[in-house]
Amino acid sequence: MSWLDKLLPPKIKQTDPKSRKGIPEGLWVKCPSCEAVLYRNDVDANLHVCPKCDHHMRIGARERLDGLLDPEGRYEIGQEIVPVDTLKFKDSRKYPDRLKEAMDETGETDAMVVMGGAIHTLPVVAACFEFSFMGGSMGSVVGERFARGAQNALEQHVPFICFTASGGARMQESLLSLMQMAKTTAMLTKLAEAKLPFISVLTDPTMGGVSASFAFLGDVVIAEPKALIGFAGPRVIEQTVREKLPEGFQRAEFLLKTGAIDMIVDRRKMRDEIAQLLALLQRQPADALA
């Protein structure tokens, strides 16, 4: 040991790399809007809304329903219905392979979850798209679950609510998926005849066959802030008309300004706002929300 080593403080001992504790994956989330780095638990507690800029991130169907419905008395509708490859469809991959991958990634059997329950004790049936499952595409299972949810609302004589988050009809089911547009709108006609409220909540994104069928048929049509809503995507429209679209075109704020939707509601206030609407539509007393 040299005289210089004796003067210097002892070195910090190196630990075995295998014994070091790393930061768990997914502990932090980056806001896609303001790019702030956020603690995941804070984001989850805030219903996936950025606490810095209020950007509404995409949220899973079950998380959304957990934040909407009262904890007691929930029941799922149509979970036993699963997709089948009736057409033996194959593009770059087989349809069953795509389904299996989506099921493994999301834990769901298709792109919609339907539950019965209550919002501030007011009984409802609520359907919600799972965008992570093949882009929330509407196939025969989604259409059937929607129809069964509406039928359950008819039988229970309660309002029906649907949160949309979809790229449109599922191409792997071809005409079968397009038939769901007629099927879902027909069920809403029955709800209207029974004078039962249907509230449609448009979230990011609501496109294609979903926006062209039942999404805008609500007695009240709500959207989340800055949600992308339309039929064809903005890039497709620009390429077709060969013109630059206005800023904010197909966003919720643009649709509210032009009268296509009724209101924009922050996700954190959605439960209370829907409860107030239901009480108003059903002529419930004010103390029903206590």
Swiss-Prot record:
**The keyword Lipid biosynthesis is assigned to this record:** yes
Which InterPro entries does the UniProt entry name for this protein? AcCoA_carboxyl_beta, Acetyl_CoA_COase_Trfase_b_su, ClpP/crotonase-like_dom_sf, COA_CT_N, Znf-ACC
What pathway is it annotated to?
Lipid metabolism; malonyl-CoA biosynthesis; malonyl-CoA from acetyl-CoA: step 1/1
Residues binding Zn(2+)? 31, 34, 50, 53
Q: What is its EC number?
A: 2.1.3.15
Q: What does the record give as cofactor? A: Zn(2+)
Give the catalytic activity.
N(6)-carboxybiotinyl-L-lysyl-[protein] + acetyl-CoA = N(6)-biotinyl-L-lysyl-[protein] + malonyl-CoA
Q: Name one GO biological process term.
A: malonyl-CoA biosynthetic process
Kindly list the GO CC terms recorded for this protein: acetate CoA-transferase complex
Note accompanying the cofactor annotation? Binds 1 zinc ion per subunit.
Q: Name one GO molecular function term.
A: acetyl-CoA carboxylase activity
All disulfide bonds of the chain are none
Database matches in PROSITE patterns: COA_CT_NTER (PS50980)
| Zinc finger C4-type: from-to | 31-53
- Give its localization: Cytoplasm
Alphabetically sorted, this entry's keywords are: ATP-binding, Cytoplasm, Fatty acid biosynthesis, Fatty acid metabolism, Lipid biosynthesis, Lipid metabolism, Metal-binding, Nucleotide-binding, Transferase, Zinc, Zinc-finger
Q: Name one Pfam family in it.
A: Carboxyl_trans
Please name the NCBIfam families in this protein's record.
accD
Q: Which family does it belong to?
A: Belongs to the AccD/PCCB family.
Function statement: Component of the acetyl coenzyme A carboxylase (ACC) complex. Biotin carboxylase (BC) catalyzes the carboxylation of biotin on its carrier protein (BCCP) and then the CO(2) group is transferred by the transcarboxylase to acetyl-CoA to form malonyl-CoA.
The record's note on quaternary structure and interaction partners says: Acetyl-CoA carboxylase is a heterohexamer composed of biotin carboxyl carrier protein (AccB), biotin carboxylase (AccC) and two subunits each of ACCase subunit alpha (AccA) and ACCase subunit beta (AccD).
Protein's UniProt name:
Acetyl-coenzyme A carboxylase carboxyl transferase subunit beta
Originating organism: Burkholderia cenocepacia (strain ATCC BAA-245 / DSM 16553 / LMG 16656 / NCTC 13227 / J2315 / CF5610)
Organism lineage string = Bacteria, Pseudomonadati, Pseudomonadota, Betaproteobacteria, Burkholderiales
